[in-house]
Amino acid sequence: MATLFIADLHLQTEEPAITAGFLRFLQGEARQADALYILGDLFEAWIGDDDPNPLHQQIASAIKAVVDAGVPCYFIHGNRDFLVGQRFARQSGMLLLAEEERLDLYGREVLIMHGDTLCTDDQNYLAFRAKVHTPWIQRLFLALPLFIRRRIAARMRADSKAANSSKSMDIMDVNPQAVVDVMERHHVQWLIHGHTHRPAVHELQANGQPAWRVVLGAWHSEGSMVKVTPDDVELIHFPF
């Protein structure tokens, strides 16, 4: 019995090794799980479910095969792929979840999320996030021709990279009080998230008791997952 969590694969055609590693993961470890949760940034960018990128169809088919094998797959949007919609969800067999979800895993209450909303010290990012999550702005963007959406997405990624290069490492990490606040709001002692690309298990205090925050790593030269069993919560890195 095990439930698996992954995040921050940032799949793109320019990184075929990561795609190959993910496909092997779906054909192997994922098939043995009780469920698979993808906590955002599965893709480096997402400009709409109507994008005919062959990579998207390949990934949808691979995830659907896992679902068809009896392993439910769930998805929480990240800051790169927040426009993933119901069309792709149907193609892949995944169920789209809310930004914050509380799970009962073998008697252990666990909160899961992408993690970007915990970075409350980065006010510029939060302002940008609020803007691009505005429903009418999303509808307007998705109504644009694909070639224009690609240009906008490329410019946004370039601007984000430039902005992050001038930010301190601390400002791009989670705010400790934001972590405690969200755990106490959901009455949990465990939090699993991604986004920061700083894999670790942090011990803290929440709800007047010991608590743990497990941070998933990004997939670069190796894979990263959290494996929850009735007896343990493990942060695991593995070769592609």
UniProtKB/Swiss-Prot annotation:
Q: Which domain of life is it from?
A: Bacteria
Name the UniProt key words of this record, in alphabetical order: Cell inner membrane, Cell membrane, Hydrolase, Lipid A biosynthesis, Lipid biosynthesis, Lipid metabolism, Manganese, Membrane, Metal-binding
Q: Which cofactor does it need?
A: Mn(2+)
**This enzyme's EC code(s):** 3.6.1.54
Q: Which reaction does it catalyse?
A: UDP-2-N,3-O-bis[(3R)-3-hydroxytetradecanoyl]-alpha-D-glucosamine + H2O = 2-N,3-O-bis[(3R)-3-hydroxytetradecanoyl]-alpha-D-glucosaminyl 1-phosphate + UMP + 2 H(+)
One record GO biological process: lipid A biosynthetic process
GO cellular-component terms in the record? Answer: cytoplasm; extrinsic component of plasma membrane
Q: Which residues bind Mn(2+) 1?
A: D8, H10, D41, H197
- Main function: Hydrolyzes the pyrophosphate bond of UDP-2,3-diacylglucosamine to yield 2,3-diacylglucosamine 1-phosphate (lipid X) and UMP by catalyzing the attack of water at the alpha-P atom. Involved in the biosynthesis of lipid A, a phosphorylated glycolipid that anchors the lipopolysaccharide to the outer membrane of the cell.
What this protein is called in its record is UDP-2,3-diacylglucosamine hydrolase
- Which gene carries the instructions for this protein? lpxH
